[in-house]
Swiss-Prot record, chain A:
Native organism: Oncorhynchus mykiss
GO molecular function, one term: proton channel activity
Any one of the GO BP annotations: proton motive force-driven ATP synthesis
The organism's taxonomic lineage, starting at the top: Eukaryota, Metazoa, Chordata, Craniata, Vertebrata
Subunit structure: Component of the ATP synthase complex composed at least of ATP5F1A/subunit alpha, ATP5F1B/subunit beta, ATP5MC1/subunit c (homooctomer), MT-ATP6/subunit a, MT-ATP8/subunit 8, ATP5ME/subunit e, ATP5MF/subunit f, ATP5MG/subunit g, ATP5MK/subunit k, ATP5MJ/subunit j, ATP5F1C/subunit gamma, ATP5F1D/subunit delta, ATP5F1E/subunit epsilon, ATP5PF/subunit F6, ATP5PB/subunit b, ATP5PD/subunit d, ATP5PO/subunit OSCP.
Top-rank taxon, per record: Eukaryota
Recorded name of the encoding gene: mt-atp6
Signal peptide: none
Protein name in the entry: ATP synthase F(0) complex subunit a
A family per Pfam: ATP-synt_A
InterPro entries: ATP_synth_F0_asu, ATP_synth_F0_asu_AS, ATP_synth_F0_asu_bact/mt, F0_ATP_A_sf
Membrane topology term: Multi-pass membrane protein
Cellular compartment(s): Mitochondrion inner membrane
Amino acid sequence: MTLSFFDQFMSPTYLGIPLIAVALTLPWILFPTPSARWLNNRLITLQGWFINRFTQQLLLPLNLGGHKWAALLTSLMLFLITLNMLGLLPYTFTPTTQLSLNMGLAVPLWLATVIIGMRNQPTAALGHLLPEGTPVPLIPVLIIIETISLFIRPALGVRLTANLTAGHQLIATAAFVLLPMMPTVAILTSIVLFLLTLLEIAVAMIQAYVFVLLLSLYLQENV
Amino acid sequence: LGAGLVQLAHLHTSPNSQAPVPALPEKGGKTRHGIIPEELFQILYPKTGVTGPYVLGAGLLTYILSKEIYIINHETFAAACMGTVIIYGVRKFGPDVAAFADKLNEEKVQKAQEVKDLAMTSLAQAIQDEKKEQWRAEGRQMLFDAKRNNVAMLLETNRRERVHMVTNDVKKRLDYQIALQTLHRRMEQEHMVNWVEKNVVTSITPQQEKASIAKCITDLKVLAKVQQAKTTA
């Protein structure tokens, strides 16, 4: 039965067409193009407001070099949040549950921050490997630890995958055992399912935000 | 190359002119129960009345379930939960979000309106000021008259001063002449008195002097006698 529980995460194909491509690109139509009008309808106004506020907040700690990444980070955030939220609907496929997608986003972006840091300010970038104020005997060990911590940063992608997969799986399992259950016990399971739903909505938004936030943090260190 | 240029000239042109931009509708399409467009009910009303679309919906649902075109599985429960949360969220926070979006637009309009109002008030004020200036300019005749009066008064004052000055000067000269004349007369009088006195003094002969002294002595004696008589009496 374990295989059928994870069936929901199999990348769907239809007649040889990988439908994940559709799942990745179709949510784009949910975002209306900002029009040339001065006063817009509510959706475009809210969308513009949200994007402006988010970009402003995200770029606060970054210096001018990091501002080049504004479009990338904001569009990444919108992308992830849309995919996560849409995946909560029934019978939908969440592309961000695929490790390949998340690592494909995390590793190149993380590597870009590392390379930028090493290229533009190698001393400062290497200096991050040793925090200030460490006692002298600890220095060799700490450098090794910090290097490991640096290379484990692509776990950004793993974090996203794990959180979303776990959440979806929990919802699926709770709903599955709810199906043949007696009504009296079913009420408890329904409550569990309801709470899980609320959690998943929160997790979907938070995980997308955390992804982008950590990336901006890595950028801040290196740029 | 010529054909390409012809095509280039036709970029960004179209026979439809969109200016001025057509206005957006005020409100979105009307919906029944938040999801189903009102038009469906209007379309079915002539043939099936008010309950038509509901019967259609119920029948479709029953058909899909009974023919097992849609099977109730675990996703149904997950969908029910998610649906509850979504509907609750939209019903509770929908109006607030809409009000917020409207407020954003309102603020935008209000900022522009403020600029316009400020311009209007400043222009109206400018008109008022201009009118006042025109009214002031009408009174310029009075101003000129007043100024002319001032100048005339100054001239008059000046003339009178000069007249006084002349009068004083002439009076001074006449006074001088008078003083000169009185001086002359006084000197002549003094001189004459001195001459008369001198002549009188020189004309007093010694015998006249003796006679006058003798008279004085007799007079004194008489006076002494009288005085004596008064004291003894």
